[in-house]
Amino acid sequence: MGIEELYKELHNVNASRESRLKHSEIILNDLTLLPLLIDIMFRVDDKISCRAAWVFEFVCIKYIYAIIPCLEKFTQNLHKVHYDSAMRSISKICALIARAHNSNDPNPLKKALLPRYKEYIIESCFDWLINEQKVATKVHAMETLFLLGKDSNWIHKELVNILERDYQTQSAGFQARAKRILRKIKSTL
């Protein structure tokens, strides 16, 4: 399957869990399609990019290590995504990367996530937190920053400042996650 066939197939994806799961299995069964999926996902002015992001999220949920050969392209292009539904999936993938990187178990992502890739993720997550984004994107961003911040004190300091500043004006979902993250950060100080 080439990029045009994959693009056509993505027209069949809908927001249902079954649809996203079914299409993620197509990618997982042929990982040579993953770079093509990512190319489509970063056609950020095309609504089909959202469907590609949904599928990619499910690929990463099932097998996060599939992202390793594509980390550079993924991290360098994060900041370009602007559709809300794609941003939610992209921010969730960042959280999955951070969880794998922060895991106590040895895994290939720990070595593959180079400092510059972390910087791209951190920068995008801070942008999502301070700009007008949906709560799901912000929640995944704060989790990612908390996990990646374990390696750098400045990240936690900045995260605490933002969460405390924005706490009163944000939604209940934001507040619940912010309270949990703040508690975790303060317990490590």
Model-derived regions: residue spans:
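Alpha-helical scaffold domains
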Residues: 1-189
